[in-house]
């Protein structure tokens, strides 16, 4: 039985060690279970506000932008996206949900932002002024186009009227025609719709053409005045052959090139400016502001021209032709003597022709001064009182400035057709032949007409529309009478 004691001792040791291990394992497992339960209780449930991944989803970028949503293909597409200045539209004291409303107000309807303003319909308070401007523009356009085309066609188709004098008048009519045909529709369209046709190109081309037209008129009046002075003081015979085409083109080239060279700074001075309209879209306007991309030397010259433009405009395009005409007329009157005394070397018909030419020069100068005076007054007022005037007043002065140029282009050919007898008679003959088909039959039915009357009719018709077979005799200087 002695061997049972070691067995009993070993069993007691094994049991003691096993019970202690089991109790430790149970205790550790119980502690681990409690820790797991506490961890599960401390972890927030899914969908609550304290969830970790949700904090990452609340990231707000520094700037947010709205991109155009797909719209109907027939609608107008916005030109650029609109960005908000605030990082979060819900902040800065705004209530939640105002961000979407802000974006809708900024974006607006594309058709409303890019549509052309039409003040003619529906009829409002501004419609009456728009209709008045359109009616006045149509009258000026019709009168100017018909008159200038008539002067150019008469001089072109008449052999006896192809002199330097009449060619200068025809070139004057050509420039007035170009100004009325191209500049008048652009200016009226901009005044009514507040949109500029051809954009920046028209802002530069319209002032260039208008100033070139003023230069052509100025130098033409100076050339006509010099011609009258030369005729009055020259001791050479008062008649000479019809001038050749090369001589006429050389004189016209001097006038045209000089006028266009003086108008070149207008191409670099004007720019297109767009401002937001109070209702919808933008308002186009042309402003005098040289481009910063110009070379430094050119930019300084343009700035100098801008600063001196008003007085240069007044001196060169207003005072110069008036002083030239007045001086030449005074010298001519002094050389020719009082109206009652006629020189012995001059016939009565030639004296009448020269008097008519002098009246033409004086009439052109008076009309030119009358039409350009409002333009110069507006330039001076804008230069010195622009800060004290409202935007509506400045726009009105600009419109008066433009219409004064258009009035000059429309009244000048009418004056030429009324004062210059050959041009006026040719215009009436042309209208009679175009409107009355019985003009030719009336001459055939009159069988009792004398031979002198027939000869006079043939000479009269050949003067204006037919080139004679042989070289014509010597003709008086200027417009034949």
Swiss-Prot record:
Tissue and organ expression note: Highly expressed in brain but not in heart or kidney (at protein level). In the brain, highly expressed in cerebellar Bergmann glia (at protein level). Detected in the hippocampus but not in the brain stem or neocortex (at protein level). In several key cardiovascular centers of the central nervous system including the caudal and rostral ventrolateral medulla, the nucleus of the solitary tract, and the A5 nucleus, detected close to, but not within, tyrosine hydroxylase-positive catecholaminergic neurons (at protein level).
Ranges for region Disordered: 25-55, 75-101
Pfam families for this protein: 7tm_1
PTM section of the record: Undergoes metalloprotease-mediated cleavage which reduces its constitutive activity.
Polar residues bias (residue ranges): 78-88
UniProt keyword list: Cell membrane, Cell projection, Disulfide bond, G-protein coupled receptor, Glycoprotein, Membrane, Phosphoprotein, Receptor, Signal, Transducer, Transmembrane, Transmembrane helix, Ubl conjugation
Principal cellular location given in the protein's record: membrane
TM segment ranges: 135-155, 168-188, 206-226, 252-272, 311-331, 361-381, 399-419
Disulfide bonds: 203-286
Residues with the Phosphothreonine modification: 479
GO biological process, one term: cellular response to reactive oxygen species
Gene Ontology MF, one: G protein-coupled receptor activity
Signal peptide residue numbers: 1-24
UniProt-annotated location(s): Cell membrane; Cell projection, Cilium membrane
Entry-linked PROSITE patterns: G_PROTEIN_RECEP_F1_2
UniProt record similarity statement: Belongs to the G-protein coupled receptor 1 family.
Name assigned to this protein: G-protein coupled receptor 37-like 1
């Amino acid at each position: 039985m002695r061997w049972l004691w070691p067995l009993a001792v070993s069993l007691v040791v094994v049991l003691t060690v096993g019970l202690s291990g089991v109790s430790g394992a149970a205790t550790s497992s119980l502690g681990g279970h409690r820790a797991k339960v506490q961890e599960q209780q401390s972890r927030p449930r899914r969908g609550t506000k304290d969830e970790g991944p949700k904090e990452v989803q609340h990231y707000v970028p520094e700037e947010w932008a709205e991109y155009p949503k797909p719209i109907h293909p027939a609608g107008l597409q916005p030109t650029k996206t609109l960005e908000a200045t605030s990082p979060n539209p819900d902040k800065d004291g705004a209530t939640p949900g105002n961000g979407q409303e802000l974006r809708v107000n900024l974006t607006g309807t594309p058709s409303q932002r890019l549509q052309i303003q039409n003040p003619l319909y529906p009829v409002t308070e501004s419609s009456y002024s728009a209709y008045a401007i359109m009616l006045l523009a149509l009258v000026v356009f019709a009168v100017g186009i018909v008159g200038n085309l008539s002067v150019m066609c008469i001089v072109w188709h008449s052999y006896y009227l192809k002199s330097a004098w009449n060619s200068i008048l025809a070139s004057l009519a050509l420039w007035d025609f170009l100004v009325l045909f191209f500049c008048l529709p652009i200016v009226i369209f901009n005044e009514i719709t507040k949109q500029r046709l051809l954009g920046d190109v028209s802002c530069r081309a319209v002032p260039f053409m208008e100033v070139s037209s003023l230069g052509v008129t100025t130098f033409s009046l100076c050339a006509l005045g010099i011609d009258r002075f030369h005729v009055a003081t020259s001791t050479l015979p008062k008649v000479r052959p019809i001038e050749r085409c090369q001589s006429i083109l050389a004189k016209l080239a001097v006038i045209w090139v000089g006028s266009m060279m003086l108008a070149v700074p207008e191409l670099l001075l004007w720019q297109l400016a767009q401002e937001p309209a109070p209702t919808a879209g933008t308002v186009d306007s042309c402003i005098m502001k040289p481009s910063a991309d110009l070379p430094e030397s050119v930019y300084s010259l343009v700035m100098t021209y801008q600063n001196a433009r008003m007085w240069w405009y007044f001196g060169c395009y207003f005072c110069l032709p008036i002083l030239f005409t007045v001086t030449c007329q005074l010298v001519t009157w002094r050389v020719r003597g009082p109206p009652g005394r006629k020189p012995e070397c001059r016939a009565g018909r030639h004296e009448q022709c020269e008097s008519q030419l002098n009246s033409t020069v004086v009439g052109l100068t008076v009309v030119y001064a009358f039409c350009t005076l409002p333009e110069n007054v507006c330039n001076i007022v804008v230069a010195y009182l622009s800060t004290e005037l409202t935007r509506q007043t400045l726009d009105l002065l600009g419109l008066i400035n433009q219409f004064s140029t258009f009035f000059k282009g429309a009244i000048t050919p009418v004056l030429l057709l009324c004062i210059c007898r050959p041009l006026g008679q040719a215009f009436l003959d042309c209208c009679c032949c175009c409107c009355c088909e019985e003009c030719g039959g009336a001459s055939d039915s009159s069988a009792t007409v004398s031979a002198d009357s027939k000869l006079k009719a043939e000479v009269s018709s050949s003067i204006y529309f037919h080139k004679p077979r042989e070289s014509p005799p010597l003709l008086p200087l200027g417009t034949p009478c």
